[in-house]
Amino acid sequence: MMNKFCEHFVVGIIKWKLFTNWEGNMVRILFLLHDLGQGGAEKVLVNLVNNMDRSKFDITVITLFGGGVNEQFLLPHIRYQTVFKRMIPGNSKLMKLLSPQQLHRLFVKEQYDIEIAYLEGPSARVISGCCSPNTGLISWVHGEQRTRAAASRSFRSEREALDCYNRFNQVVCVSDTVKRDFESIIRLDHESIVLYNTVESEQIRELSKDDAPEVIDDGCTKLVAVGTLKEVKGFDRLLRIMKRLKDEGKMVHLYLLGQGKLAQQFEQFSVENRLDDRVTMLGYQTNPYKYVAKCDLFVCSSYSEGFSTAATEALIVGTPVVTTLVSGMKEMLGENNEYGLVTENSEEALYQGIKQLLDHPDLLDHYRKQAAIRGKMFSTENTVRAVEEMLMNLNVGLDDDSKR
């Protein structure tokens, strides 16, 4: 009997060692997302996994498509895999040909304690296909969906979207606004939670001290905007506002950081409207902070956001923020504009907000001081600890009735 016990014990130890990858009793975590491009959510994921406790978590990041600019910033201990080396045109439609379970079997080859879809849409559909009762599933929602049709765009139907999201043990939203929006559209079996984005605050402050010779002293108030050059960021209306301000004789210069499909269109608009001397397009920058820190005002012109990483970073370096009313901004800047100026989500309102700050330097100076105060609330340690506690609690809970 003792020999039989020893045999079972040794086999059990071997199985346990294989499962934990010979790295002790660590929690194996998978983060899956579309790619590691220049978007805010992608940058936030890198910040998060790089700062998680490597003695407790064995982390793998899988992207459906490779080639993203944020891949280079993953620390060496983070396992990184891509399903496809480059983006495949029409991939969302192609993936709908397969069920979530089939996609999961194709894309996820190992066993994990917790699997996280770090963006809504295709990533959530894949992770919802996990069939292991011993694996905790988390869906991370970064942006407002507004309608059930929009939330279901990457799914075969609205019914499939509802079924998939309700397979997750936990849904995490990046702001209260996103949480209210998502829960009004997707009826979850349990309440979602809010966890704020992780930013590298100390590193950002240090990098912001670097020289930025492109930012010139031309007697203009310097505006800065950062983001992918796509429709949702609203840079088209920001450029129209710049034309209007110049026509009115306002001395203002916009520095636009980012790359994307609308770059050529924006450059053409600047030339046609004689904004060459008032708009500088700097493309994608690995260190945007040095530019933001040397400008007088950060502008978020977006039609929609989750919890703006770029606006958060502006506050961290002490640059005042004016923004359209998108999700997370009231939480970030205060219900009554205590820490920055939030306008209605329209071109006219944003124009009036920028003009107000240009016409009242004392108000701009006030928000510069308030930005420095608010920027101190964004702590890398606190946001990472909150995520780690959620993961550990979920992992423990998988041993009880919370199993799917």
Summary of predicted features, one role per range:
Residues 125-127, 166-192, 199-203:
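A short, active-site helix/loop in glycosyltransferases that binds the activated sugar's phosphate group
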Residues 95-101, 136, 145-167:
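Nucleotide-sugar donor phosphate/pyrophosphate-binding loop at the beta->alpha transition
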Residues 31-39, 43-47, 51-94, 192:
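N-terminal strand-loop element at the rim of the active site
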